[in-house]
Amino acid sequence: TNKALRFIRPDVQAMHAYVVQHSVGMVKLDAMENPFTLSPELQAKLGERLGAVEINRYPGARIDDLKNALAQYVDLPAGFGLMLGNGSDELISLLSQACAVPGAQDRAKVVAPEPGFVMYGMSAQLQGLQYIGVPLQADFALDEAAMSAAIAQHEPAIVYIAYPNNPTANLWDADTIRRLITQVSAYGGLVVMDEAYQPFSSKSWLDEIRQHPAANAHVLLMRTLSKFGLAGIRLGYMLAPTALINEIDKLRPPYNVSVLNAECALFALEHTEVFAQQAAV
């Protein structure tokens, strides 16, 4: 046994690594990627854009341009801020970091329905938070009573609600979500509405946030450009009231989004109709 392993956390050594299976010769459905490539004309235009990027420089003003473009794309509500992540995975990790109190006797908790996105639990574990998964009902419906009981018992720092759910595709009942959000608000917890699959959905919780901002003051809304059609560039974004997003953004590593990724995203946002047509298929 390598002696240096004694300094690697036991819980990390006990974990199984997240493995991406090779998909050569297979119809790959598990990752829900956009199967369409860009037209030759758009590929050429994107190539020209990327060729002009100053890759000798650290990311700068173009990151701000991207944030502004995304804010315009989602019609960011007044008083809200927006931050970028290297995929939603990084944003989930930053949320766990923000809520993990070093040396705390009572560990912060994370609650989410299961089956759900694996990174909720994995990021919680890696940051020393306790993860509580709440099983869905037999028909994959959200078990409101069980979720409410878990929230009452554990008072989690974070409650994740995927809208629609990954991997079951459920779009949870809005009244149920409102009640859970109100319950979490009573003790000061956070609710993260994960809208990774919003391009395939007929609804967005952002409309609810606009209509009832006070009731959603502790809600963060997270999205990714992966299901938009850009899984290869690894770009997620999260929006919330400015005071809240500013605290999470303090933990973001500098230059976490590359200039090439930012330019790809800006190009895509200039051609949203193309990606919307692909998602509709």
Describe the function of each predicted region.
Residues 37-38, 168, 196, 200-201, ...:
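Short acidic/glycine-rich loop or secondary-structure boundary segments that cap or lie
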Residues 9, 39, 43, 63-67, ...:
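A general structural signal for well-ordered alpha-helical segments in protein cores
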Residues 54-185, 192, 197-216:
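Conserved core of the PLP fold type I
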Residues 1-57, 155:
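N-terminal "arm"/small-domain region of PLP-dependent enzymes with the aminotransferase-like
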Residues 14, 28, 84, 112, ...:
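Structural signal for conserved beta-strand scaffold positions within catalytic alpha/beta enzyme cores
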Residues 29, 159, 194-196, 222, ...:
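Structural scaffold positions in well-ordered secondary structure
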Residues 39, 218-281:
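PLP-dependent aminotransferase class I/II
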Residues 33, 165, 226:
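Glycine-rich beta-alpha junction loops
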